[in-house]
Amino acid sequence: MSKPINSVVSKVISVLGLLALMSPLNVTAQSDEITFHKDIEPILQRSCQNCHRVGGVGPMPLVTYDQVAPFAGLIEYKTGLRDRAGAMPPWYMEKDIGIQDYKNDPSLNDKEIVAISTWARSGTPKGDIADAPEPLVFDDSLKWTAGEPDLIVRTNSVTKLAGTADWWGEIDRVPVSIEQDRYVKSVEVVEVNDVNNTTGTGRDTVGGRYIFHHMIWSTAELDEDGNRVEESVTGWPVHEVGRNPDIFDPEGGRLLRSGTYIYSDSVHLHSNGQDTTGHLEIGFRFHPLGYEPKYERVSLGLGNGVDISIAGNQDNQELHAYTVLEQHTKFITFEPHLHAPGERMCLEAIWGYTVETLACVGYDHNWVRGYAFEDDAAPLLPKGTIMHIVGYMNNTETNPNVPDPRNWQGSGNRSVTNMFIDLGMRVKMTDEQFHEEMENRRQVLNLSPNDHVIGCPLCGAPLVAPMAGNEEASD
């Protein structure tokens, strides 16, 4: 017996209507799906592949889908650490406090971290190859991240045997081969050794690829006995494992004198697990001939390396250090330096009744990072400002960098003893330069009387009290 025609038509219409309703949802679901080629690969290219590729220093390449998918869970975990020790990429600036504008920032934003987690937990869908970005091409003959140097100075090679004790001491002086004094806009130190970057040494840490833990160095003329002529000394940022290049303020270049030598009486070598021969290459990039710096560097004793006391088996221990700015000062970088139990450092500026946090940074002793403020975000602080750093120490078994948390720790050079310093770069300014910098900041940021600039307590003063500013100008 045939069914009534109106019943059949009704069911067909119902099915077609249901399909019509479902189809847009299905298309939307497909377009919203997090896939490797569309969503994950661009993140890896920007923030990971410089190290995680064949020939890079990362422990595994993260270029193709087949290379990345097996490590999806680990990548989710490492990126989810955000600003704590062990996080990848190794950038530990906290994003919920202080200044947030930095140069060469490879960190992931919240949306990217969530995308990686979603992708890892949804079966690592590959997606359409048509969505993939163009593959990056790396030139392994270029080892300089700040740009090709104008001058490269090489130290003499040294050999560190597998399993031997750490060594501290001097290395040979090396001449700086330039015919005239030059101002330097950036300096970068890299270790070149015979470790096979493909096979590694069996050590998982960054230091496992290298034998130089650090070098404190300067350039100076030498007297007939080979000693430094003190008035000729120029200090340079310390080289440490995992350190990024040092780029000086564009108007505060540092002087490299002709006739000087690379001088270091504080080099730390360590075994990486296999016999290794290596040397350091120091790359200087110069300002053009005729350049004269507008600003001079200023050294601040902001830290404590003398009377540190860290109890065993205790977390959340704090260290504090203060100094007062004797000149108007522009902060170029913030570089927290702690040792094994260090987990975090914050930088504060105290001006009048205002206590302001400029930055808080997680700390990982495997990666010693400097954080360069963007030009229009660099702190501009008046003389008389009290600078304050706070170090947070974790001397418990939850800190994998601590070999035995039962031990009390004091001050010292070794990683199992402690330092607590801000090694950042700063320049000093005259009254006129300070006011000029603040006026430029007001113009660039288009500040109104209701705006506040972190790290520049007086930037808004002429906007809030213009009459007072005019009276001072007339005086």
Where are these predicted regions, by residue range?
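Extended, compositionally biased non-globular segments
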Residues: V324, I332-S415
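Solvent-exposed, flexible loop/coil segments flanking beta-strands in beta-rich domains
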Residues: A132-R203, G273-P341, T398-A473
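Noncatalytic modules at the cell exterior or secretory-pathway interfaces
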Residues: V184-K185, G253-H270, P379-N395
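Aromatic- and Gly/Pro-enriched helix-to-coil junctions and flexible linker segments
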Residues: T28-V174, S186, G259-D265
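Short, surface-exposed beta-strand/strand-loop-strand elements in extracellular ectodomains
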Residues: G200-L222, R344-Y353
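Short acidic/polar inter-strand loop motif in beta-rich domains
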Residues: G123-G127, L269-Q274, Y392-N401
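Long, hydrophobic/aromatic-enriched structural stretches that serve as scaffold segments
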Residues: A87, I216-S266
